Amino acid sequence: IIGALLLIYLGVFCYLNLYKYAQHVDSDIAAEALLAREIWTEKDIAPDDWISSTERRIIGMPTVASVFYGMTGSMQTAVGITCILLGAVFLGTFYYFLRKLSLGRPAAITALLVLCALPANGWRNEGQMVPFVTLLLFLFAEYYVFHGIFLFFGILFYLKLREERKLTKKGLLSWLVLFVVAVLLNCGGQRCLQVVILPLVVTEVIALFLESGHLREKLPGGRYLATGYLGSLVVAFLISCLYGGRGDYAVYLLNPKEAVEKLLITVPAAILENFGLAGNAKVGSFDSLIQLFLWAFLILLGYGIWYIFRKRSDVSDQEKRTVGILLTSVGVTAFIIGITSAEAAHYYFFMTWFAAAVIVAVLVEHLTGKQSAFAALI
């Protein structure tokens, strides 16, 4: 049943990408298609005559779509094919990521369905609701699909270095590829630094502090391979600063009163809205029913976090570290937005979707057989 529901979602995504692009297009979405055409016409990944509002990306959906535009001559068809292709690669990467964490197939497929079906917010067009998660990962624009793919491979490589504490030729090649991708992603903005690199660095600093007995004990040399890898990602960001691909717009630190109010009220509200809890639904209506289900789902996530990080837990260290990294990413984003004048847009917290999907997968994996009825309910 879970697999069938997932296929239905994927079929809907394919249909929307190929046949409903014009119905849901806006200025931001149209700009992605126009950029794809411009890249092909000028034969330049970052055309000089293209004026970017916030960033000049080197890799992104338009980069791939430009190839299909050259083949088809249609911006709409090119974007549709590209979004289907990249969405499939993204879901395949996420599935591979979950399986490498030793999660079973039912748990992994459930997580994929959660990622496709969970967010209930978005914008309406002719009575149809298009959740923002689909715009970010599956439909029309796919702004953060490359960040998601890089995140999953980056976490897996980090965990591998922490556990094996040695570097093979294959590992060195993987390191080099991830470093190059980090440079390219960072050239287009600070999102990669914010949602991938900084959370990994924070996680590593805390881990080193605890493993070294509060800096009193010396750790084996191989343990610092993971630290070196994260250091190289920071270097990748510094190298990308030479490119100058970010928009020159000012962000200011808030005064303490404003920062506390934003951290305690605005940011949590944005995270809740990110899941679809927007309010303004008449009690008894379908919208109110969906939002009640979302509240129940958030309670489930709270239980999942407790289950994963409790002292007597049968959850593996890999699974704990992965959930910890994803939650840290949400925390880093919340902190940066909370203390600055940056807009607290709900879709900036898209990492909560990944964290939620992994938490559900872990619960399904470990409760199946022990609490089969509860696992089936999830």
Question: How would you label these PLM feature ranges?
Answer:
Residues 171-191, 196, 201, 231:
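Membrane-interface alpha helices of multi-pass inner-membrane proteins
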Residues 166-171, 208-226, 300-329, 340:
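Membrane-interface helix-loop-helix junctions at transmembrane boundaries of multi-pass membrane enzymes
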Residues 142-144, 194-195, 293-299, 303, ...:
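Hydrophobic/aromatic-rich transmembrane helices and adjacent perimembrane loops
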